[in-house]
């Protein structure tokens, strides 16, 4: 699933090509995504212009003249900018055609993505108003994590992946941040002190920042808006490296399922 760095990479890729452009037409080939694409979307968007491209957690916010498109890439979604004469593929479900002969094409093989429309403040939309703070903003720090982890019985890994606690931290980057912080993913969130949470907040920010700079992580099918893979996979310390030696101590990296998600850790370096 595209996580925060991948979504931010897409945002940066499409923004300069959308802002100021008018929407000529909208083509919906398959409306049955995670939630059906609203039938009114086609008519609502024609003639509007893009004003900005934002992000909240893993959601893209395409601000238009009269409202906002809220788009989630789901498990396998991608956005590409193509010319209008580019043949569409089997999983190209939506085209937003611009007035310059190009179109924003949404591809989603597994159809877990979503495209919503709101004319109200998008941050008050039910999908967004429940989200915790952005992990790269100042509100997200060790004091915040310590305060919100008290009396929680969940594991620290599940805790930092809870989008109500912090927006956009998925499985890949949770594994990496916990490794760099030296915290075992199974450790109870309520049994971690302030100093260790300060370290975890720092490593989370570092991992996410570095991933954004590398264009995200491509493990299976993530591509940037210009069709290129993300290169942070080359920098992963622990994710996907089961039985490989720990880059710090050489102990074989262990893999187990925690909360139905693949969790990688070093038995010597993480406690």
UniProtKB/Swiss-Prot annotation:
Described function: Involved in base excision repair of DNA damaged by oxidation or by mutagenic agents. Acts as a DNA glycosylase that recognizes and removes damaged bases. Has a preference for oxidized purines, such as 7,8-dihydro-8-oxoguanine (8-oxoG). Has AP (apurinic/apyrimidinic) lyase activity and introduces nicks in the DNA strand. Cleaves the DNA backbone by beta-delta elimination to generate a single-strand break at the site of the removed base with both 3'- and 5'-phosphates.
Protein name: Formamidopyrimidine-DNA glycosylase
Active-site residues annotated for this sequence: 2 (schiff-base intermediate with dna), 3 (proton donor), 58 (proton donor), 261 (proton donor)
Keywords from the named record: DNA damage, DNA repair, DNA-binding, Glycosidase, Hydrolase, Lyase, Metal-binding, Multifunctional enzyme, Zinc, Zinc-finger
Upper classification of the organism: Bacteria, Pseudomonadati, Pseudomonadota, Gammaproteobacteria, Chromatiales
InterPro entries associated with the record: DNA_glyclase/AP_lyase_DNA-bd (IPR015886), DNA_glyclase_Znf_dom_DNA_BS (IPR015887), Formamido-pyr_DNA_Glyclase (IPR020629), FPG_cat (IPR012319), MutM-like_N-ter (IPR035937), Ribosomal_uS13-like_H2TH (IPR010979), Znf_DNA_glyclase/AP_lyase (IPR000214), Znf_FPG/IleRS (IPR010663)
Zinc finger (FPG-type): 237-271
Family as reported in the entry's similarity comment: Belongs to the FPG family.
Domain of life: Bacteria
SMART domains listed in its UniProt record: Fapy_DNA_glyco, H2TH
UniProt EC number: 3.2.2.23, 4.2.99.18
Cofactors: Zn(2+)
Pfam families hit by this protein: Fapy_DNA_glyco, H2TH, zf-FPG_IleRS
GO molecular function: 8-oxo-7,8-dihydroguanine DNA N-glycosylase activity; class I DNA-(apurinic or apyrimidinic site) endonuclease activity; damaged DNA binding; zinc ion binding
PANTHER family: FORMAMIDOPYRIMIDINE-DNA GLYCOSYLASE (PTHR22993:SF9)
Disulfide-linked positions: none
Cofactor info, note text: Binds 1 zinc ion per subunit.
Catalytic reactions on record: Hydrolysis of DNA containing ring-opened 7-methylguanine residues, releasing 2,6-diamino-4-hydroxy-5-(N-methyl)formamidopyrimidine; 2'-deoxyribonucleotide-(2'-deoxyribose 5'-phosphate)-2'-deoxyribonucleotide-DNA = a 3'-end 2'-deoxyribonucleotide-(2,3-dehydro-2,3-deoxyribose 5'-phosphate)-DNA + a 5'-end 5'-phospho-2'-deoxyribonucleoside-DNA + H(+)
GO biological process: base-excision repair
NCBIfam families linked to this entry: fpg (TIGR00577), PRK01103.1 (NF002211)
């Amino acid at each position: 699933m595209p996580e925060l760095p991948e979504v931010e990479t897409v945002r940066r890729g499409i923004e300069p090509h959308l802002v100021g452009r008018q929407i000529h037409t909208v083509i919906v080939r398959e409306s049955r995504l995670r939630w059906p694409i609203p039938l009114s979307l086609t008519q609502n968007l024609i003639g509007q212009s893009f004003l900005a491209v934002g992000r909240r957690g893993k959601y893209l916010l395409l601000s238009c003249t009269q409202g906002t498109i809220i788009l989630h890439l789901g498990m396998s979604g991608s956005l590409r900018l193509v010319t209008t004469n580019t043949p569409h593929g089997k999983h190209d479900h939506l085209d937003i055609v611009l007035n310059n002969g190009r179109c924003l094409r949404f591809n989603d093989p597994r159809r877990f993505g979503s495209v919503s429309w709101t004319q109200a403040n998008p941050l008050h939309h039910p999908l967004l108003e429940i989200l915790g703070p952005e992990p790269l903003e100042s509100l997200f720090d060790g004091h915040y994590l310590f305060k919100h982890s008290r009396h929680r019985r969940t594991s620290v890994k599940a805790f930092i992946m809870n989008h109500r606690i912090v927006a956009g931290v998925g499985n890949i980057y949770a594994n990496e941040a916990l490794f760099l912080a030296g915290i075992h993913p199974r450790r109870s969130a309520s049994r971690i002190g302030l100093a260790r949470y300060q370290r975890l907040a720092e490593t989370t920010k570092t991992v996410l920042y570095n991933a954004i700079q590398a264009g995200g992580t491509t493990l299976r099918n993530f591509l940037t808006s210009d069709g290129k893979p993300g290169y942070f996979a080359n920098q992963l310390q622990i994710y996907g490296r089961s039985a490989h030696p720990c880059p710090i101590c050489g102990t074989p990296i262990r893999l187990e399922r925690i909360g139905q998600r693949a969790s990688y850790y070093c038995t010597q370096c993480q406690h």
